[in-house]
């Protein structure tokens, strides 16, 4: 994989160089010391992946991510030394299309390979994600029965560009929204709690991490909060599981959507938002085949038109809508 480093700190650059050296297939093609330089270098030589710092002179990592994704899009991972202090910037960058975030590898420790492992694992996942194919497996659903009570659920999946998209969508919903909402966003568990807090503050809706064994409740937004997959169980509660191990992104949108297909007996809507790759497309297809309404974000409003495009390609979406139109549609569906 051809990789670029954007960072103004020599020690951080050296730490990234040493980490990448453990995988000979990775080639560093250029290094930029600020965002403006990175934007220009991408025009001249677009890498497969950029390891992007956040705080830099001239142009910071958030604006550089926005410019690069608009002009010469490629995979971007945010690398930061202080995730707590930079949490808001992390989500802003992800809103512009950054795929993930990882701590800067430690340098000079007793086990440098172990220190490099989280970064190398992220890169491996992204390499796989870029090259994956849409499966055609059919999900066998339990027969849909008339529910004893009108349970309502909105299942939402998002990846690159997701935080900003989720903020816009949730802002469009009233506090009295009558359906439960479960979000599956591709984000590392160390950032999940911060993301829930940020979304809650930005949207005005109660957003918190989903807990093992709890039941989705109307008007409450639950965010998958670990690096395991989240599933709906037969009794209507939520559970985290390491299986299936072959799903690279954790939590997997497909896994959750398919569990909704199997076990949700009330009304449901599946929504697939911006993101790179194809996670969620097959799960959305399963929800449609079950008879649920399915919505995919359109190309014009997507920061990264990967997952919604994959869904459209296999006819998984009943409706394809611009992001600002999705919340009003959900209100319409559940207030008829």
Swiss-Prot record:
Protein modification: Phosphorylated by CheA. Phosphorylation of the N-terminal regulatory domain activates the methylesterase activity.
Leading EC class: hydrolase
Location of the active site: 159, 186, 279
GO cellular component terms, A-Z: cytoplasm
Alphabetized InterPro entries for the sequence: CheB-like, CheB_C, CheY-like_superfamily, Sig_transdc_resp-reg_Me-estase, Sig_transdc_resp-reg_receiver
Keywords noted in UniProt: Chemotaxis, Cytoplasm, Hydrolase, Phosphoprotein
Disulfide bond keyword on record: no
Modified positions (4-aspartylphosphate) in chain numbering: 53
UniProt superkingdom: Bacteria
KW Phosphoprotein (keyword) present: yes
Localisation: Cytoplasm
Alphabetical GO biological process terms: chemotaxis
Reactions catalysed according to its record: [protein]-L-glutamate 5-O-methyl ester + H2O = L-glutamyl-[protein] + methanol + H(+); L-glutaminyl-[protein] + H2O = L-glutamyl-[protein] + NH4(+)
All residue ranges annotated as the CheB-type methylesterase domain in the record: 147-336
Gene Ontology MF term list: phosphorelay response regulator activity; protein-glutamate methylesterase activity; protein-glutamine glutaminase activity
Response regulatory domain mapped to chain residues: 2-119
SMART domains named in the record: REC (SM00448)
Membrane-spanning residues: none
Enzyme Commission code(s) on record: 3.1.1.61, 3.5.1.44
HAMAP family noted in UniProt: CheB_chemtxs (MF_00099)
Similarity annotation: Belongs to the CheB family.
Role according to the record: Involved in chemotaxis. Part of a chemotaxis signal transduction system that modulates chemotaxis in response to various stimuli. Catalyzes the demethylation of specific methylglutamate residues introduced into the chemoreceptors (methyl-accepting chemotaxis proteins or MCP) by CheR. Also mediates the irreversible deamidation of specific glutamine residues to glutamic acid.
Domain free text: Contains a C-terminal catalytic domain, and an N-terminal region which modulates catalytic activity.
Protein name: Protein-glutamate methylesterase/protein-glutamine glutaminase 3
Lineage: Bacteria, Pseudomonadati, Pseudomonadota, Gammaproteobacteria, Pseudomonadales
């Amino acid at each position: 994989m051809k990789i670029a480093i954007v960072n103004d700190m020599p020690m951080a650059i050296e730490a990234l160089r040493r980490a990448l050296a453990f995988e000979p297939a990775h080639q560093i093609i250029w290094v930029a010391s600020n965002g403006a330089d990175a934007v220009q270098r991408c025009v001249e030589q677009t890498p497969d992946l950029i390891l992007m710092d956040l705080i830099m002179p001239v142009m910071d990592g958030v604006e550089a991510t926005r410019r690069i994704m608009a002009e010469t899009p490629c995979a971007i991972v945010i690398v930061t030394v202080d995730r707590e202090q930079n949490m808001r910037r992390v989500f802003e960058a992800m809103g512009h299309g950054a795929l993930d975030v990882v701590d800067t590898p430690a340098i000079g420790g007793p086990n440098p390979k172990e220190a490099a492992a989280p970064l190398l694992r992220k890169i491996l996942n992204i390499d796989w994600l870029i090259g994956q194919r849409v499966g055609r497996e059919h999900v066998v659903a339990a027969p849909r029965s008339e529910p004893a009570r009108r349970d309502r659920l909105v299942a939402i999946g998002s990846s690159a560009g997701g935080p900003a998209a989720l903020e816009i969508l949730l802002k469009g919903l009233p506090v009295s929204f009558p359906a439960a909402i479960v979000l599956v966003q591709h984000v590392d568990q160390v950032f999940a709690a911060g993301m829930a807090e940020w979304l809650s503050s930005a949207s005005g809706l109660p957003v918190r991490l989903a807990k093992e064994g709890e039941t989705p409740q109307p008007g409450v937004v639950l965010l998958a909060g670990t690096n395991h997959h989240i599933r709906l169980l037969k009794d209507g509660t939520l559970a985290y599981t390491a299986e299936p191990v072959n799903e690279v992104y954790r939590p997997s949108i497909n896994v959750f959507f398919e569990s909704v297909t199997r076990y949700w007996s009330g009304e449901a809507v599946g929504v697939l938002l911006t993101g790179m790759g194809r996670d969620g497309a097959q799960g959305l297809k399963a929800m449609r085949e079950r008879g649920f309404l399915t919505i995919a974000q359109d190309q014009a409003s997507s920061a990264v038109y990967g997952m919604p495009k994959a869904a459209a390609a296999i006819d998984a979406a009943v409706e394809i809508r611009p992001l600002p139109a999705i919340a009003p549609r959900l209100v319409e569906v559940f207030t008829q």
